Amino acid sequence: MEEEIRNIEENDGIRLTWNVWPAKGDATTKIPLACLYNIHQTADVLECEPIYCMSCNSVLNPHCNIDFGRQSWNCVICNNNTTLPSHARGITPDNLLPELLPQNSTVEYVLSRESVFPVVFFLIVDICTFDGERHTLLKDTLKVVLEKIPEDALVGFVKYGTNIELLELNAEQPRRTHLFSGRKEYTAEILKSLGGASKSESQIVGRFLRRKDECQELLYNMVESLERDPFPVLPAYKPVRCTGSAVSLAISLLETSFPDMAVKYLLFTQGPCTFGPGTVTPIKFKEKGRNEHLEENDPMYAGPARKFYTGLAERMNSVGHSLDILAATIVDVGICHMERLTGMTGGMLIMAQDFDRDIYISSCSKILDRSSEGCLVQGFNAKMHVKTSKNLEYKGVIGQGRSFGGSWRMGSMFPSTNISLLFDKKPDAKHGEFGYVQLITQYQRSDKRLLVKVTTFARMFTDSREDVIYGFDQEAVAVFQARFLLLKKYEEIKDCERMIDKNLIRFTKTFARYDKGEPSSLALPDSMAYYPNYMFFFRRSLLVQTGNNSPDETTYYSTLLYNQRVSDALKLIKPTLISYHYQGGVEAVEVDSKSLEPDVILVLDTFHNVVVWRGEYVAQWVREGYHEQAEYEFLKDILKSSEERARLLCNERLPTPQFCITEQNKSQQRILHHYVNPSGGGSIITENINYEKFEEALRRVVVFNSE
């Protein structure tokens, strides 16, 4: 079943918690019926219009029945017949339309119409940089981003610190800059009343927005001459930074002139908002020169800031715009309060801790990567409609975006974007019949072309408990349960742990076989056997053990969990560990202290960290230079291949993870020690129980507790 599940994911981008659906029983009351969908995964492209059902607007797909005599098709969603259009008439069983072929359960249609405007990139640049070196980092990053923006894209630029400066990009001399106060929130109405800034798209384009190829030299000169905020920072005070006001100004400038169009705001920042609407922290340090973390639940700032940024996110979502937060800093910038700006719009969140230059520049660059066709890999202004057959009910979505106007809307989506769709069977679902789901997503490509992606899948309802259990996808369930359980904000870590334990106990009682009072008799079916292990590692992950995280770090990790495809999100729950033996063996090993052997190299992948660890013997051999000797070529090979594997993971991933090479008894070894199960092997000192004790406690609770 596992191979079949992965083949389906590769073709359709879907993972289901249950791949066989119960017609009766309580299986889905313990684990909901959910679909984890890679909404922007690549698919076969058809240069034609979709064929819609006249009754329910579903799209023709391989599951539909074709009446070749009448040249009509039966919709599996509403069960009504629709006549085939003229261009599709004459098809036969041996001459089918591409969308009817079994392998084309997911296809993308390139529509004949285009968007009026190309993609708009509006740069919102924080000039309250940390110091001269970090100001250079900002300028270098801006140059990389400008280089990768498409030539025909429209570009705008605003910089802010204490005040906001909106720059004109036209060819007129002298070129004007409009200065705005950072004290207030801006709306489209306010800008119109000011007279000079915003009246219509005809005034904005050519003035505040220009094609990149028409103003490229001007933009580069602006970046090269970009100066830090001229207002001095007093001792024991933070820079006066009006992030909220600047973002509201940018949105207000474009929301009425570019509704339902591809607009991307890129927010470059190096610190928290300390002034004006959206302030997340007081301007004065509690202690002179001290960089403290934000107080996530500070009543003076947290509530108003979240409300303000949520309002901005709703405005962007309603017109199909999105915002990326590109932060490089050593302090919290307020992501814990601003998360809706990306979460509700489909934007990307980059957090380069300690001003890590490689992570910051490479992550910002990857946002603008291109496909083999030359278009940006991200899609814009996406609207997804969910269709279900009459025996299923669509319940909603967990993940990026927002329900708006009868669809699920996201201003942008990346190849890695994953959302969770919830369904429930209706009472009239019957054994032996199929339930059908169709996901229809329209979006704009960076070349102005409009596309419609259609994914259709079907699963059988059954009364057989064994068949339902056989179709259980424990990896997808682990990711979904983590997302579902973390929707709630817990006051204490113990509260979250108790909720995880409670759900795991209920699950085990429902599906395990055991003899009352006999812990050793408990056994889960093979398809579920690894699920308790995932929950054990979930309890130990940085998603739950947030005590040593800053509020921004906790928000960042949870954002990754909600946004990444199953295989990557699973690494946040339980990392992968690859072992390279000095005799040439390469294999995946358990994330366990017993795997830390002295004669191996380990590659740990936690998604946000990639670590190459060299065992004690290997590290000693390297120090003594054995890998440079011809007779020890094998040692040189595993050193090279392990590092290449790690760097490949970093190069392919967005955001770019932190990377380090360490060895036995070095400081960075603590990263590996944090994640491995402390089973007793190796020299790991910890207060955490190991999996064996956790599993034994679970067994005892289940077999001795009759509740």
From Swiss-Prot:
<keyword id="KW-0256">Endoplasmic reticulum</keyword>
<dbReference type="Pfam" id="PF08033">
    <property type="entry name" value="Sec23_BS"/>
</dbReference>
<protein>
    <recommendedName>
        <fullName>Protein transport protein SEC23</fullName>
    </recommendedName>
</protein>
<dbReference type="GO" id="GO:0006886">
    <property type="term" value="P:intracellular protein transport"/>
</dbReference>
<dbReference type="InterPro" id="IPR036180">
    <property type="entry name" value="Gelsolin-like_dom_sf"/>
</dbReference>
<keyword id="KW-0931">ER-Golgi transport</keyword>
<dbReference type="InterPro" id="IPR029006">
    <property type="entry name" value="ADF-H/Gelsolin-like_dom_sf"/>
</dbReference>
<comment type="function">
    <text>Component of the coat protein complex II (COPII) which promotes the formation of transport vesicles from the endoplasmic reticulum (ER). The coat has two main functions, the physical deformation of the endoplasmic reticulum membrane into vesicles and the selection of cargo molecules.</text>
</comment>
<keyword id="KW-0813">Transport</keyword>
<keyword id="KW-0333">Golgi apparatus</keyword>
<dbReference type="InterPro" id="IPR006900">
    <property type="entry name" value="Sec23/24_helical_dom"/>
</dbReference>
<feature type="binding site">
    <location>
        <position position="53"/>
    </location>
    <ligand>
        <name>Zn(2+)</name>
    </ligand>
</feature>
<dbReference type="InterPro" id="IPR007123">
    <property type="entry name" value="Gelsolin-like_dom"/>
</dbReference>
<keyword id="KW-0862">Zinc</keyword>
<keyword id="KW-0479">Metal-binding</keyword>
<dbReference type="Pfam" id="PF04811">
    <property type="entry name" value="Sec23_trunk"/>
</dbReference>
<comment type="subunit">
    <text>Component of the COPII coat.</text>
</comment>
<keyword id="KW-0963">Cytoplasm</keyword>
<dbReference type="InterPro" id="IPR036465">
    <property type="entry name" value="vWFA_dom_sf"/>
</dbReference>
<dbReference type="GO" id="GO:0070971">
    <property type="term" value="C:endoplasmic reticulum exit site"/>
</dbReference>
<keyword id="KW-0472">Membrane</keyword>
<comment type="similarity">
    <text>Belongs to the SEC23/SEC24 family. SEC23 subfamily.</text>
</comment>
<keyword id="KW-0653">Protein transport</keyword>
<dbReference type="Pfam" id="PF04815">
    <property type="entry name" value="Sec23_helical"/>
</dbReference>
<dbReference type="GO" id="GO:0090110">
    <property type="term" value="P:COPII-coated vesicle cargo loading"/>
</dbReference>
<dbReference type="GO" id="GO:0005789">
    <property type="term" value="C:endoplasmic reticulum membrane"/>
</dbReference>
<feature type="binding site">
    <location>
        <position position="56"/>
    </location>
    <ligand>
        <name>Zn(2+)</name>
    </ligand>
</feature>
<dbReference type="InterPro" id="IPR036174">
    <property type="entry name" value="Znf_Sec23_Sec24_sf"/>
</dbReference>
<dbReference type="InterPro" id="IPR006896">
    <property type="entry name" value="Sec23/24_trunk_dom"/>
</dbReference>
<feature type="binding site">
    <location>
        <position position="78"/>
    </location>
    <ligand>
        <name>Zn(2+)</name>
    </ligand>
</feature>
<dbReference type="GO" id="GO:0005096">
    <property type="term" value="F:GTPase activator activity"/>
</dbReference>
<dbReference type="InterPro" id="IPR036175">
    <property type="entry name" value="Sec23/24_helical_dom_sf"/>
</dbReference>
<dbReference type="InterPro" id="IPR037364">
    <property type="entry name" value="Sec23"/>
</dbReference>
<dbReference type="Pfam" id="PF00626">
    <property type="entry name" value="Gelsolin"/>
</dbReference>
<dbReference type="InterPro" id="IPR037550">
    <property type="entry name" value="Sec23_C"/>
</dbReference>
<dbReference type="GO" id="GO:0008270">
    <property type="term" value="F:zinc ion binding"/>
</dbReference>
<dbReference type="InterPro" id="IPR012990">
    <property type="entry name" value="Sec23_24_beta_S"/>
</dbReference>
<feature type="binding site">
    <location>
        <position position="75"/>
    </location>
    <ligand>
        <name>Zn(2+)</name>
    </ligand>
</feature>
<dbReference type="InterPro" id="IPR006895">
    <property type="entry name" value="Znf_Sec23_Sec24"/>
</dbReference>
<keyword id="KW-0968">Cytoplasmic vesicle</keyword>
<dbReference type="GO" id="GO:0000139">
    <property type="term" value="C:Golgi membrane"/>
</dbReference>
<dbReference type="Pfam" id="PF04810">
    <property type="entry name" value="zf-Sec23_Sec24"/>
</dbReference>
